[in-house]
């Protein structure tokens, strides 16, 4: 259960201003990121845990779910976390043409702007799929793609004990961007153990810094 995605072998050659794969290695910071929310039960529970540890994160939201649960999105922003774009409907991006991909992204940005006032948000493609035309289109429009360097594997539906054991065996390094999901309880169960452990190791938890 190696937490580092294979795509990093290729993505490390792509400028970070186009596809962000990790933060600064010199800082003892971890970047917690959560995909597929907001969820009416799991996201608030996760926000409670983050608040208890003074941790800030980035939430890559599905547009239609953000529209469905605006109160949860408002709380995310109010508590100092950062919103990211995870498409409108979480489709299989490599099955869409470029115009449809762009609409998935821009429709979500328009909605998120109503919550945080930001004109543009970091985009994380569903399932990490990176069609080349989409990447080039994002570069042309100045929209950064945010990938990850450390995969919690919480979507694998393995028991939390196995995910915790993997996180302990393969500890994250400074600047890592951690991939998690807030559409189930697994990330919460993982972080209930690992947040205190990482904090005890001197880590602080910050959202991804917005692109220029």
How should each PLM-predicted stretch be described?
Residues 2-96, 100, 104, 111, ...:
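Active-site beta->alpha N-cap acidic-glycine motif
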Residues 25-26, 170-173:
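Extracellular/periplasmic catalytic domains that process cell-envelope and extracellular macromolecules
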Residues 34-36, 61-63, 85-87, 125-127, ...:
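A cross-domain feature marking catalytic cores of carbohydrate-active enzymes
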Residues 35, 50, 59, 83, ...:
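Divalent metal-coordination and catalytic microenvironments
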Residues 45-46, 71-75, 133-137, 190-194:
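A short acidic, amphipathic alpha-helical/loop segment
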Residues 173-211:
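Catalytic grooves of carbohydrate-active enzymes
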């Amino acid at each position: 259960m190696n937490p580092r995605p294979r795509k990093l072998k290729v993505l490390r050659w792509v400028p970070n201003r186009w596809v962000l794969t990790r933060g600064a290695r010199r800082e003892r910071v971890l970047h917690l990121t959560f995909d597929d929310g907001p969820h009416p039960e799991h996201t608030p529970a996760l926000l409670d845990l983050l608040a208890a540890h003074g941790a800030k994160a980035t939430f890559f939201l599905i547009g239609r779910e953000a529209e469905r649960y605006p109160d949860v999105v408002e709380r995310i922003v109010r508590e100092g976390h950062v919103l990211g774009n995870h498409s409108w409907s979480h489709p299989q991006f490599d099955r869409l043409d470029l115009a449809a991909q762009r609409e998935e992204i821009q429709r979500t940005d328009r909605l998120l702007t109503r919550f945080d006032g930001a004109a543009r948000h970091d985009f994380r493609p569903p399932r990490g799929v990176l069609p080349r035309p989409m990447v080039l289109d994002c570069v042309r429009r100045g929209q950064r793609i945010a990938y990850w360097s450390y995969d919690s594997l919480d979507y694998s539906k393995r028991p939390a004990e196995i995910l915790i054991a993997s996180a302990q065996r393969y500890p994250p390094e400074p600047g890592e961007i951690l991939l998690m999901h807030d559409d189930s309880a697994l990330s919460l169960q993982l972080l209930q153990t690992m947040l205190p452990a990482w904090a005890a190791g001197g880590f602080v938890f910050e959202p991804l810094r917005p692109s220029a």
